[in-house]
């Protein structure tokens, strides 16, 4: 078994919907919901929701790159979001719900940029990809009740995943491509 561990940080709108797809993959050691990219130290959910902290809801993933490489994380990430929407994701609007790939080193940046370019050229989306690739910033874990929300509140999570429009978007854009 490999001893390697790396971090990947992705903002993809509501973090509730970003945990499950990664959590279920081999080589994923930990998926944590939280906040990143802003100026407020140790923000609360309520503060982030005001769109005044500069933070985005995000997930930070600890993974073994020998089992689940960063390139595969990127592929899975793109399939969870609308990368053409710079105003938020699905039913959630505002700065805190914008997408972003937070890179932890130069190799991640190179892979993220190549992945974004490939997606832009794929023709899957009619509009340009606006997801930003940013340097990793301090990551602040969200409150405990947000962690692994899909396990703690299955019915509400499923209702939200569908009701927000995310599930339908994923189905219409990726069902025959993954």
Curated annotation (Swiss-Prot):
Pfam families given in the database record: PMSR
Annotated InterPro entries: Met_Sox_Rdtase_MsrA_dom (IPR002569), Met_Sox_Rdtase_MsrA_sf (IPR036509)
Residues of the active site: 14
EC number: 1.8.4.11
Broad class of enzyme this protein falls into: oxidoreductase
GO biological process, alphabetically ordered: protein modification process
Keywords of the record: Oxidoreductase
Oxidoreductase in keyword set: yes
Catalyzed reactions per annotation: L-methionyl-[protein] + [thioredoxin]-disulfide + H2O = L-methionyl-(S)-S-oxide-[protein] + [thioredoxin]-dithiol; [thioredoxin]-disulfide + L-methionine + H2O = L-methionine (S)-S-oxide + [thioredoxin]-dithiol
A molecular function (GO) term: peptide-methionine (S)-S-oxide reductase activity
The keyword Nucleotidyltransferase is assigned to this record: no
Recorded family membership: Belongs to the MsrA Met sulfoxide reductase family.
Database matches in PANTHER family: PEPTIDE METHIONINE SULFOXIDE REDUCTASE, PEPTIDE METHIONINE SULFOXIDE REDUCTASE MSRA 2
Its biological purpose: Has an important function as a repair enzyme for proteins that have been inactivated by oxidation. Catalyzes the reversible oxidation-reduction of methionine sulfoxide in proteins to methionine.
Annotated HAMAP family: MsrA (MF_01401)
Matches recorded under NCBIfam families: msrA
Protein name: Peptide methionine sulfoxide reductase MsrA
Native species: Bacillus pumilus (strain SAFR-032)
């Amino acid at each position: 078994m490999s001893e390697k561990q790396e971090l990947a940080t992705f903002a993809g709108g509501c973090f509730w919907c970003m945990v499950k797809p990664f959590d279920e993959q081999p080589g994923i050691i930990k998926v944590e919901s939280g906040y990143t990219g802003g100026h407020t130290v140790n923000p609360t959910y309520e503060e982030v929701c005001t769109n005044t902290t500069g933070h985005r809801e995000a997930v930070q993933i600890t993974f073994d790159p020998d089992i689940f490489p960063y390139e595969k994380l990127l592929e899975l990430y793109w399939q969870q979001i609308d990368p053409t929407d710079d105003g938020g994701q699905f039913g959630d609007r505002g700065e805190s719900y914008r997408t972003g790939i937070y890179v932890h080193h130069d190799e991640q940046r190179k892979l993220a940029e190549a992945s974004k370019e490939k997606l832009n050229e794929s023709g899957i989306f009619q509009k340009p990809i606006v997801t930003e690739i940013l340097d990793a910033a301090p990551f602040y874990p969200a409150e405990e009740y947000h962690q692994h929300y899909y396990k703690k509140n299955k019915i509400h999570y499923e209702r939200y995943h569908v009701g927000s429009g995310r599930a339908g978007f994923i189905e219409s854009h990726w069902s025959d491509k993954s």
